[in-house]
């Protein structure tokens, strides 16, 4: 029925807040910080590299930072989806 797509987030820093509307053509705007002038844009994983290059060429964009959450080690105590490791105690 529905297929889960890999999506990622880009943090786009702007010179002016009025330019945040222009980012809606690149993906889904999730959050806009008016005080710190950045926008979180979610998009499909396969479009990220091309979109970063396009956004860096735009005059209203200061900086583009991709999300690194996929690269972090999420195997820690308290994580519900971690791989079960054999217990040392018993």
Swiss-Prot record:
InterPro entries: DUF2129 (IPR016979). Its main location: cytoplasm. It is found in: Cytoplasm. Keywords: Cytoplasm. GO terms for cellular component: cytoplasm. The keyword NAD does not apply. Belongs to the UPF0298 family. This is UPF0298 protein SSU98_1559.
